[in-house]
A protein has these predicted regions:
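Radical SAM enzyme core and accessory elements
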Residues: 1-14, 19-20, 29, 35-36, ...
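Short hydrophobic segments within beta-strands
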Residues: 12-14, 44, 102, 128, ...
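A short, glycine/small-residue-rich beta-strand->loop->alpha-helix junction that serves as a flexible
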Residues: 16-25, 103-108
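Conserved C-terminal portion of the radical SAM core fold
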Residues: 36, 50, 98, 126, ...
């Protein structure tokens, strides 16, 4: 038995090197809860290690999906050491009693490398996060994983650590699956959902100071995330949130996974983040900002505009955008809005993605943001099941019909637990044993999850998908008389790269106002601009 103050927890956050991602709230809240109960807690985060080749930021700049920013190097220095060696050294120095991994499907294999190192030193390993929640059998089957935590893990992990510290059985801890020495698995059910208004404030002190910085609209800012709510009331087929709703509803635990923090809790937490960590920019961490009750938004807007006033970024859906809401956001000091378009074909978007909105609605919503002079980043995804080149050009044409400051174009990868994953599985599009999982034909660096695809589609090749992603912004912004040359730029060879570089110079003239932007509103859908 150990006193809690002598029990050491080491959390591991496997991440792609120098990926421009925000601080994860999950491990931060877990650390806060453990420390509040007296446990020691540290974090090993792989984000700041030097990538093999370009960083994700450099790669996105090349594809014109990220504005050229002030030098990140001035704020963030990369680590040139080997992360596995550093992890071994930390284990020897810190001597943790347990190691916990935070896993996504994209980072599972990376995380297992660290689990293997920990188990070689006889340190028990548990894994939590979205991947163990929706692929629990695969994760617990790995020989380097001893326990998994499904669903919300904050207090489940606390109870688990208490049991370990007290030399008590972990067999009956809610949310946990336990692998016994004989290989049998104890599968406990989920516990109740947490009250998001009663959670402690996140402990971001476990992260290195450089992790607070992120490029945003051409600047490098000290950005901190603010969790507004958990889950989402919408039912997008590619997203895990609807599966979270089903996970808890099917067990009779809750009617929905989606819960919002109160405006008072949000404001109090924002004051804490500013005072404790010196935030000068806020990212409202929510799948859909306006999923909160409208009365809560009105209250939040009023207090934020009086007490906080920091610039902020949010993401939302087109159908939630109204002139009145945007007026209040501007009063709050909104800096950038991220809007999910995802696909430009109405029929496909409704049938496959379960996003029932018209292209005209999207155009009208983006027009409201344009009239308000707000920079907009639009998200697009391609490589969905049964997608064709023609369908992808529907998405490109929709992007040509709206005004945006930045365009993101991601390649779809199916996540276990989602409705669209099941479509891919039933149609045989998932890689089989021994198949090459992904192709990185236009990557000169370590593969990032949104710039590769694992699907084997009969309707379009991986190489063509990568070429369309490479040129998506050029197709969306340059005049149509350049389409023949852009098609050459899709190629993954010397000729294609030379043409891409040539057209990229022309694109820079476009964004500098030297060439007229192709907002083909009258041509496309008969809209006006």
């Amino acid at each position: 038995m150990k006193k809690f103050k002598d029990f050491k927890v080491l959390l591991v956050y496997p991440n792609f090197p120098m990926a421009s991602v925000l601080l994860p709230a999950g491990v931060s809240i877990i650390s806060a809860i453990l420390k509040k109960e007296g446990f020691q807690c540290r974090l090993f985060d792989t984000t700041l290690y030097k990538p093999k080749g370009e960083s994700q930021e450099e790669f996105r700049k090349k594809l014109h999906q990220l504005k050229t920013s002030s030098n990140m190097e001035e704020k963030v220095s990369t680590k040139n050491s080997d992360p596995h060696d550093d992890f071994k050294n930390l284990l020897n120095l810190y001597k943790p009693d347990v190691v916990g991994l935070s896993l996504l499907s994209d980072t599972f294999e990376m995380g297992i490398e660290y689990a293997k190192i920990a188990r070689s030193k006889n340190i028990p390993v548990f894994a939590g996060g979205i991947y163990p929640t929706f692929a629990p059998d695969e994760v617990i089957a790995n020989k380097y994983i001893d326990f998994i935590c499904m669903g919300e893990g904050e207090y489940a992990i606390l109870n688990f650590c208490k049991a370990l510290a007290n030399d008590e059985s972990t067999d009956n801890i809610k949310n946990f699956w336990i692998k016994k020495k004989d290989g049998t698995i104890i599968k406990n059910d989920l516990g109740p959902l947490v009250n998001v208004n009663e959670l402690p404030y996140p402990d971001y002190s476990i992260f290195e100071p450089e992790r607070f910085y992120r490029p945003m609209q051409g600047k490098v800012l000290r950005i901190l995330p603010m969790e507004l709510h958990r889950g989402c009331p919408y039912t997008c087929a590619y997203c895990e949130d609807p599966s979270q709703n089903l996970l808890y509803k099917s067990r009779g635990i809750a009617k929905t996974y989606h819960r919002s923090k109160s405006p008072k809790r949000v404001i109090d937490e924002l004051h804490y983040l500013i005072d404790k960590y010196g935030a000068n920019y806020i990212y409202f961490n929510a799948e859909t900002f306006f999923a909160m009750p409208n009365k809560d938004f009105i209250e939040l807007a009023d207090v934020y505009s009086k007490e906080i006033r920091l610039p902020f970024w949010l993401q939302t859906r087109p159908e939630t955008i109204t002139e009145e809401r945007i007026r209040l956001l501007k009063k709050m000091n909104v800096s950038n809005i991220n809007v999910g378009i995802e696909h430009g074909n109405e029929k496909y978007r409704k049938e496959y993605l379960k996003r029932a909105m018209s292209n005209q609605l999207i155009i009208d919503a983006l027009k409201i943001l344009d009239n308000a002079n707000l920079p907009v980043t639009v998200n697009n995804i391609m490589g969905f099941p049964d997608e064709t080149r023609e369908l992808i050009f529907d998405t490109i044409n929709l992007n040509r019909s709206i005004k945006s400051a930045t365009i993101n174009a991601y390649l779809y990868n199916p996540y276990p637990g989602t409705a669209l994953y099941e479509v891919c599985r039933k149609k045989g599009y998932l890689p089989k044993e021994g198949d090459e999982k992904a192709i990185d034909t236009h990557l000169s660096t370590e593969a990032f999850p949104y710039f590769k695809t694992i699907l084997n589609l009969p309707t379009i090749s991986k190489s063509e998908l990568c070429g369309l992603q490479k040129t998506f912004v050029l197709y969306s912004k340059l005049p149509r008389n350049e389409f023949k040359r852009i098609k050459i730029a899709e190629q993954h060879d010397e000729e294609g790269d030379e043409m891409f570089d040539l057209l990229s110079k022309k694109y820079k003239d476009v964004i500098q106002g030297k060439v007229q932007l192709p907002y083909e509103i009258k041509e496309y859908l008969g809209a006006s601009h």
